[in-house]
Amino acid sequence: MKKLLYVIIAMAAILVSCNDYETYGDKKEKERNAISKFIADSSITVISEDQFNQQGYTTDLTRNEFVKLDKSGVYMQIVRKGCGEGLSDGESTNLVCRFRETDILNDTLQAYNDVSAYAGIPDIMHVSRTGSTYTASFTSGMMYSIYGASVPGGWMVPLTYIKVGRPQSMEEECSKVRLIVPHSQGHSTATSYVKPYYYVITFEREAK
């Protein structure tokens, strides 16, 4: 009788553990729901790539527009196009990046270096362009300290559409974007835990 009871208890424990287990599909669905909720809560207007192209690769800030880029799944808002020039084909350079990172799934501010206390320690990203392909690695900064040298794919998405010059006057400003980055375009933590992240990032060339 006791043996039968032990078997029943063991089977119940297995059933509970199976019910608690999340498949990759479950996690992706949870991610999609979290992104949809974030978009709704933030009153974001999502536009297609076609509309984005027709608008001259701009997003209307008065309507809080984000374009969903089909290839990457990244949602992007261009706050400022920036000054100077974008990266030219065959070019490699260092970009100074200041950012704010939010874990969308848990609605938690994870990391930032966009305040005066961290003004002297931005992230430095070494980036190269070959045709339409960008590759990059962090060489120093907070992202480098937390996640290592690998740059999230989502961070490179805006480089096709912005200028990365360094402001030379009060009238000029560095480029600034807002991104919703799914786990597939995120850093190692995002990929491992199937978590989407929200970023506010500025880019400019490093002073020579």
Where are these regions (language model features)?
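Cross-family detector of peptidyl-prolyl cis-trans isomerase
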Residues: 18-208
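Sec-dependent bacterial lipoprotein signal peptides
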Residues: 1-18
